[in-house]
Amino acid sequence: MKTVVVDTNVLIRFLAGEERYRHAFDAYGRILVPAVVIGEFKCGTDGKTAKGRQQKKALETFLAKACVELIPMGEKESDWYAEVFRVLKRQGTPVPQNDMWIAATALSHGAPLLSDDAHFGQMPMLRLV
């Protein structure tokens, strides 16, 4: 079964109904969502407006799918986070901390990352789709 980790920007576009992302998700039998992605998503919606309630419901529906798994930050992810940090520091290429956690989740699960953020390309050990 093909597995992919999703970044926040992709999740937002998928939940907004963008066709390109719906087809991208159809290619995978297992979709991993790092906890930090959910946190970032929730920062962008308050759940109090009609649009916010719709976004919250869309997220809940998505997370309830059998192929979707919410991934907490654990020891494996922490080890990979430290490695990503060291590599980026040596390269002199800073990346937002949350994105290092997202990359660490993909690396700890041996899965590629689906993202539109170009700075993930600065991580040579990370596979992107």
Where do the protein language model's features map onto the residues?
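Acidic, PIN/NYN-like endoribonuclease modules and their adjacent C-terminal/linker elements
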Residues: 103, 107-129
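Active-site neighborhoods of divalent-metal-dependent phosphate/nucleic-acid chemistry enzymes
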Residues: 43, 69-112
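Phosphate- and divalent-cation-binding pockets in alpha/beta enzyme and binding domains
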Residues: 40, 80, 122-123
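Alpha-helix capping/helix-boundary segments
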Residues: 10-11, 37, 77, 101-102, ...
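Short, well-structured N-terminal submotif of metal-dependent ribonuclease cores
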Residues: 1-37, 43-61
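Short, structured coil segments at secondary-structure junctions
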Residues: 27, 66, 123-124
